[in-house]
């Protein structure tokens, strides 16, 4: 039974509807609950996902101890459980980047105002979200310094001073850092003022090379989400007015959350020569002629963790795909006070670690039921139950987190069979999420049909559009928030008329409400 909600005002974050009525996140109260449950089952203060999706999300983030609120409005503290997931994401992506010859760098946090103003479209796009440093100690600065919302201007300033010849190209760089954007409405992981991310920036000798890199990094993100996060998606180019500030083209990866809303999960941008020309980045080619460079940028942030939670989580907490789980398996001794149980459990721990598994043991004095519940909240993909009878029969019981299936495995085979089980979980989780996505994509050829579909169903709708932003605004108003997510360019259009105005359609697009 879910305990009643308590409405607790909190000054550390904005309080949109997403947070109103959330349960207390007090460590003291949470500790009391768990102390009371020591000899019973761990009390999970998690609202049902279907009852209140926003509250469910907040509860999971809290109960799994992924983050805590900061005393700075709109910012958050990444706790060990949450940061460990980010470290797994970092390690996987960093490997993928380096396989494409990306090099890591680190550029400053602060950007002079004059530098930010060199590219008008770029600064116009970020102006409402910029935070400024105006004083150094007690002295007012002669020029304001922007706390980076993104780093295109810093990279371009550096390259303008260091790139001279075609021999200096390409530059294919990435940095892992945090950025600050003064968001008005904040949600843990999904939208906070300061967040962690990676931002890749490249310059190339030719338009074709830069376009190729843009598409290549877009593909890296798609592979990452499919193979590591077990998250299916739709993907395509953004509409003209949805492109990143200053970009000629933006390619997006859009995942569908369990509540039917889309999440922009990663983007790759092609800038062409316009942005670097504003910074006078030129190089001398093989014919000794001065040429412009062509730029790209691409990024993925900690909102990927929010997407992971909302795609795979259930009413008992997190459900982590094995390839991104910081811990793949937790060993839980049963009747551990009995002779030999703990010794054999620790032997198994050592064996699995030696075999390369990310594995831990819970040998605390809490009851097995409490330990099972905690493992479920944390989303650890498997647990191994081992008790006196198991040892006597030379076996263990492996329990899958995703579907609760119990599998009896010989102790002689556990080091090999556990890998098979984990890979099966990874595959099953992707297939389940893909089936959900596929079953929540609809088609509409009239505005009335689209409005009714959004009233009765959750998901994405394919519909045709003339490309006019005013028409999109009218659709957004009529549907209560649905907007273009990306263009569909690899399928035949389902209509030759715009869903709103009836004029000739230029694009078929995915429409959806979003985070």
Where are these regions (language model features)?
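Short polybasic linear motifs
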Residues: 14
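Short, often N-terminal, low-complexity regions
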Residues: 3-4
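Glycine- and charge-rich intrinsically disordered segments
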Residues: 24
